[in-house]
Amino acid sequence: MSVAILGKGKKVALKRRHARIRKRISGTPERPRLVVTRSNRHMVAQVVDDTKGITLVSASTLQADFAGFEGTKTEAAKKVGELIAEKAKAAGITAVVFDRGGNKYTGRVAAVADGAREGGLAL
């Protein structure tokens, strides 16, 4: 994966970090990749098998489960982690490789990981 990303700025740094991470991280059928995507308002978590190129399970703050959710964005991110762990365990997945998607491992990204660990996933 050759990505020529030049310049400075938050989005450029995000793309550079993501490209660097993806060179080393890949999901397998035994240990798929837990991808975390963060926007200003929402969090999305997907468990992906990279050998087949398919999403096995996903959870997001856009789902109906979060329709009446009141709390901080960090609390919502933790709930997304718990929800993805519940769905992954139902699909027979117990261990995943964590892909922070170029985001720094703090705040909402770390909350998703903590929620997934509390839900029973091995990261």
From Swiss-Prot:
The keyword Translocase does not apply. It holds the Pfam family Ribosomal_L18p. InterPro entries: Ribosomal_uL18_bac-type, Ribosomal_uL18_bac/euk. Keywords: Ribonucleoprotein, Ribosomal protein, RNA-binding, rRNA-binding. GO terms for biological process: translation. CDD domains: Ribosomal_L18_L5e. Part of the 50S ribosomal subunit; part of the 5S rRNA/L5/L18/L25 subcomplex. Contacts the 5S and 23S rRNAs. This is one of the proteins that bind and probably mediate the attachment of the 5S RNA into the large ribosomal subunit, where it forms part of the central protuberance. PANTHER family: 39S RIBOSOMAL PROTEIN L18, MITOCHONDRIAL (PTHR12899), LARGE RIBOSOMAL SUBUNIT PROTEIN UL18M (PTHR12899:SF3). This is Large ribosomal subunit protein uL18. It comes from Bifidobacterium longum (strain NCC 2705).
